[in-house]
């Protein structure tokens, strides 16, 4: 049973979120949440929220045990970019691109041996 959760339009660049997502992919939900508490990256908070949401969805909607869940898929897609301009010398303007991310996490129940 695959259970999915996503956070859209997170105001962090996808490149920065992917660093954090790569660390937790394939780990158990409890292990990933414990790991994310100690990662000194701004992206670790929204990633932890999405993982916790996916685990809560699995518990509430499908009556799965949170301890048996692992992160089967975790990926980040680029959202819309907010374009801003920074005024420069002689009437010039340099663009500032404020990038957004769509974070998606899919959790599965571990197979019983």
From Swiss-Prot:
Keyword rRNA processing in annotation: no
Gene3D superfamilies: Ribosomal protein L22/L17 (3.90.470.10)
Name of encoding gene: rplV
SUPFAM superfamilies, alphabetized: Ribosomal protein L22 (SSF54843)
Assembly behavior: Part of the 50S ribosomal subunit.
Family, as annotated: Belongs to the universal ribosomal protein uL22 family.
Residue runs in coiled coils: none
Top-level division of the source organism's lineage: Bacteria
Gene Ontology molecular function terms on file: rRNA binding; structural constituent of ribosome
Keywords: Ribonucleoprotein, Ribosomal protein, RNA-binding, rRNA-binding
Protein name: Large ribosomal subunit protein uL22
Protein source organism: Symbiobacterium thermophilum (strain DSM 24528 / JCM 14929 / IAM 14863 / T)
Gene Ontology biological-process annotations: translation
Keyword Magnesium: no
Record's function text: This protein binds specifically to 23S rRNA; its binding is stimulated by other ribosomal proteins, e.g. L4, L17, and L20. It is important during the early stages of 50S assembly. It makes multiple contacts with different domains of the 23S rRNA in the assembled 50S subunit and ribosome.
């Amino acid at each position: 049973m695959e259970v999915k959760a996503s956070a859209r339009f997170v105001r962090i660049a996808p490149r920065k979120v992917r660093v954090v997502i790569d660390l937790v992919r394939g780990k158990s939900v409890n292990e990933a949440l414990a790991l994310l508490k100690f990662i000194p990256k701004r992206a670790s908070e929204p990633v932890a929220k999405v993982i916790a949401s996916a685990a809560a969805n699995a518990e509430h909607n499908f009556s799965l045990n949170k301890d048996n869940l692992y992160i089967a898929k975790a990926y980040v897609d680029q959202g819309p970019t907010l374009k801003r301009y920074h005024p420069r010398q002689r009437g010039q303007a340099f663009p500032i691109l404020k990038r957004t991310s769509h974070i998606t996490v899919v959790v599965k129940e571990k197979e019983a041996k």
